[in-house]
């Protein structure tokens, strides 16, 4: 009888990838990056272990959306006080904090628990073309 392989958190080897978001569609890019953060692309994937890789996304300000989402997509947040709900459109969000758009899209595609929060920490998003992770020697990833 064969034994099913279970990844051990201490033995997981992590790689660094850099993804250029220029001209890419938001949801398509986010779903592929979320799969890499989870480790679904590895043959050693184990659901209860964080076995994903690190992902750096550059040029977040040049991400695209289809249809009328530029004006119609709304991001909500709440202060916790009565009447404290705030709404921001995609257009306003991309102007003020372009990296937040990608972060929210990818975070929504990860598990909503402790493991998902651990996976989310491996995501690094930058609005421009530069990133400070050259020492990790990230490989370019075409998505």
UniProtKB/Swiss-Prot annotation:
Give UniProt keywords alphabetically: Ribonucleoprotein, Ribosomal protein
Tell me what this protein is called.
Answer: Large ribosomal subunit protein uL13
Q: Which GO terms describe its biological process?
A: negative regulation of translation; translation
Q: What does this protein do?
A: This protein is one of the early assembly proteins of the 50S ribosomal subunit, although it is not seen to bind rRNA by itself. It is important during the early stages of 50S assembly.
Q: Could you tell me which species this protein originates from?
A: Symbiobacterium thermophilum (strain DSM 24528 / JCM 14929 / IAM 14863 / T)
For this UniProt entry, the molecular function terms from Gene Ontology, in alphabetical order, are: mRNA binding; structural constituent of ribosome
Domain of life assignment: Bacteria
Entries under Pfam families matching the protein: Ribosomal_L13
- Would you identify the family this protein belongs to, as annotated? Belongs to the universal ribosomal protein uL13 family.
* Regions crossing the membrane: none
Q: Which PANTHER family is this protein grouped with? A: LARGE RIBOSOMAL SUBUNIT PROTEIN UL13M (PTHR11545:SF2), RIBOSOMAL PROTEIN L13 (PTHR11545)
Lineage from the top down? Bacteria, Bacillati, Bacillota, Clostridia, Eubacteriales
Q: Give a yes or no for keyword Transport in this entry.
A: no
Subunit notes for this chain? Part of the 50S ribosomal subunit.
Q: Name one GO cellular component term.
A: cytosolic large ribosomal subunit
- Stored InterPro entries: Ribosomal_uL13, Ribosomal_uL13_bac-type, Ribosomal_uL13_CS, Ribosomal_uL13_sf
């Amino acid at each position: 009888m064969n034994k099913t392989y279970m990844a051990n958190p201490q033995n997981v080897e992590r790689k660094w990838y850099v993804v250029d978001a220029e001209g890419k569609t938001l949801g398509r890019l986010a779903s592929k990056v979320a799969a890499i953060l989870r480790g679904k692309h590895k043959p050693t994937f184990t659901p209860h272990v964080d076995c994903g890789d690190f992902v750096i996304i550059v040029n977040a300000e040049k991400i695209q959306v289809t249809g009328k989402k530029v004006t119609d997509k709304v991001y909500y947040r709440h202060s916790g006080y009565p009447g404290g709900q705030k709404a921001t459109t995609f257009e306003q969000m991309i102007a003020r904090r372009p990296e937040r758009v990608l972060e929210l899209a990818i975070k929504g595609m990860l598990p909503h628990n402790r493991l998902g929060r651990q996976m989310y920490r491996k995501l690094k998003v930058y609005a421009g073309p530069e990133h400070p992770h050259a020492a990790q020697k990230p490989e370019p990833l075409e998505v």
